[in-house]
Design a protein with these regions (language model features):
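Conserved, structured core segments of small domains
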Residues: 1-107
Length: 107
């Protein structure tokens, strides 16, 4: 299952900078679970982070977040979690065309 996790920063980023080495080491040991991750940037300033996870279920995501220093410390003012599905790149050839046909048939 894919999950999108969006964390919006709290404060001036001092705690983020302090926890960043431990967070990066944690992520480096678990790269297979993250499809994409990086900073959210607004007007040239980092305002948070986005993570796209590929995990077996919500319990696996919760277990990951329970040990990641960015989520165990008060780095984020808000955290949003959404289940998602990868459409691009296609999970299998022809998926997008088949999905378009299903959508047309449903209307």
């Amino acid at each position: 299952m894919n999950f999108v996790v969006i964390g919006k920063d709290k404060g001036d980023g001092a705690l983020r900078r302090q926890e960043r080495p431990a967070h990066l080491e944690y992520v480096a040991d678990r790269q297979g679970l993250i499809l994409y991750a990086g900073p959210l940037i607004e007007r040239g300033r980092m305002i948070g982070s986005i993570f796209i996870f590929d995990v077996p279920d919500r319990a696996a995501l919760d277990a990951y977040l329970a040990d990641d220093p960015y989520f165990t410390r008060p780095i984020f003012e808000t955290i949003e979690i959404y289940e998602s599905r990868c459409m691009v790149p296609e999970s299998e050839p022809g998926f997008l065309v088949a999905e378009a046909e299903r959508s047309r048939a449903a209307t």
